[in-house]
From Swiss-Prot:
<keyword id="KW-0808">Transferase</keyword>
<keyword id="KW-0460">Magnesium</keyword>
<feature type="binding site">
    <location>
        <position position="47"/>
    </location>
    <ligand>
        <name>substrate</name>
    </ligand>
</feature>
<feature type="binding site">
    <location>
        <position position="30"/>
    </location>
    <ligand>
        <name>Mg(2+)</name>
    </ligand>
</feature>
<feature type="active site" description="Proton acceptor">
    <location>
        <position position="78"/>
    </location>
</feature>
<feature type="binding site">
    <location>
        <begin position="31"/>
        <end position="34"/>
    </location>
    <ligand>
        <name>substrate</name>
    </ligand>
</feature>
<feature type="binding site">
    <location>
        <position position="217"/>
    </location>
    <ligand>
        <name>Mg(2+)</name>
    </ligand>
</feature>
<protein>
    <recommendedName>
        <fullName>Isoprenyl transferase</fullName>
        <ecNumber>2.5.1.-</ecNumber>
    </recommendedName>
</protein>
<feature type="binding site">
    <location>
        <begin position="204"/>
        <end position="206"/>
    </location>
    <ligand>
        <name>substrate</name>
    </ligand>
</feature>
<dbReference type="InterPro" id="IPR018520">
    <property type="entry name" value="UPP_synth-like_CS"/>
</dbReference>
<feature type="binding site">
    <location>
        <position position="79"/>
    </location>
    <ligand>
        <name>substrate</name>
    </ligand>
</feature>
<feature type="binding site">
    <location>
        <position position="198"/>
    </location>
    <ligand>
        <name>substrate</name>
    </ligand>
</feature>
<feature type="binding site">
    <location>
        <position position="35"/>
    </location>
    <ligand>
        <name>substrate</name>
    </ligand>
</feature>
<feature type="binding site">
    <location>
        <position position="81"/>
    </location>
    <ligand>
        <name>substrate</name>
    </ligand>
</feature>
<dbReference type="InterPro" id="IPR001441">
    <property type="entry name" value="UPP_synth-like"/>
</dbReference>
<comment type="function">
    <text>Catalyzes the condensation of isopentenyl diphosphate (IPP) with allylic pyrophosphates generating different type of terpenoids.</text>
</comment>
<dbReference type="GO" id="GO:0016094">
    <property type="term" value="P:polyprenol biosynthetic process"/>
</dbReference>
Length: 259
């Protein structure tokens, strides 16, 4: 990724124990439907409870040395859900921005929305643009919401954008490498995630940050998303801190033994 500053400059690529620098944590917020079902509630109430969990987690992340928090809000595959549920999920983004935007802005939070804007209704597109515009100058903390996002779609869109530059004579095929390609991803302005968390006990990444997660540590937690908050996040970060990030190399102790 291009060099970054402020809260985005959160991790290095030297091997060894997980860094104590500010982190980029990404969360697959899973379990809203099961949470509601366990309580005999409609799924929509699970999603609403999930918004409250997001608010708690954003606040907790800011005090846990997290510089960037990326959350999976709505995937490109979620359009296949019942229309009423899709409408509710769209409305929740709008409600969250309208209720919390000023508080986030005053707290120094920069809001970024990654994913395709095509297919979104004008009112949702306007809310997204307003949130990004209102917080564009903030640098204390980055809240990145993946909305109408899919990892495969992001890679496809990036490939298409580069191909279009070649067609216009602005680039050559030989210009393409990992570094130049990732500049076309919607995630280009943030560093790769250090830690990807999935809640609910499921153990898969579900088309989330496919390019970006190459060297991320994965933590799977059994807690359903509406029950999530600062304590669960702290537990995930503690597990991450105990790991040895090698980036394809070997641990320092292994090198010493081999020598």
């Amino acid at each position: 990724m291009p060099a970054t500053t402020g809260p985005q400059d959160v991790s290095g690529r030297a091997g060894g124990p997980a860094s104590t620098e500010r982190l980029h944590v990404a969360i697959i917020m899973d379990g809203n439907g099961r949470w509601a079902k366990q309580r005999g509630m409609p799924r929509v109430l699970g999603h609403r409870a999930g918004v409250n969990a997001l608010k708690r987690t954003v606040e907790g992340a800011q005090s846990q040395n997290v510089g960037v928090l990326t959350v999976f809000g709505f995937s490109t595959e979620n359009w296949s859900r019942p229309p009423q549920e899709v409408s509710e999920l769209m409305g929740l983004l709008k409600a969250y921005v309208e209720s919390d935007l000023e508080r986030l802005a005053k707290a120094g939070v920069r809001v970024r929305i990654i994913g395709r804007r095509t297919g979104l209704s004008p009112d949702i597109a306007e809310v997204i643009e307003r949130a990004e515009r209102r917080t564009a100058q903030n640098s204390e903390f980055v809240l990145q919401v993946a909305f109408n996002y899919g990892g495969q779609a992001d890679i496809t869109d990036a490939a298409r954008a580069f191909a279009e530059r070649v067609e216009r004579g602005e680039a050559k095929a030989s210009d393409l490498n990992e570094k130049t390609f990732e500049q076309f991803l919607s995630t280009a302005s943030a560093p790769p995630p250090d830690l990807i968390v999935r809640t609910s006990g499921e153990r898969r990444i579900s088309n989330f940050l496919l390019w970006d997660c190459a060297y991320a540590e994965l933590v799977f937690q059994d807690v359903l998303w509406p029950d999530y908050g600062p304590e669960a996040l702290a537990a995930a970060i503690a597990e991450y801190r105990g790991r040895d990030r090698r980036y394809g190399g070997v641990a320092a102790d292994d090198v010493a033994v081999a020598g």
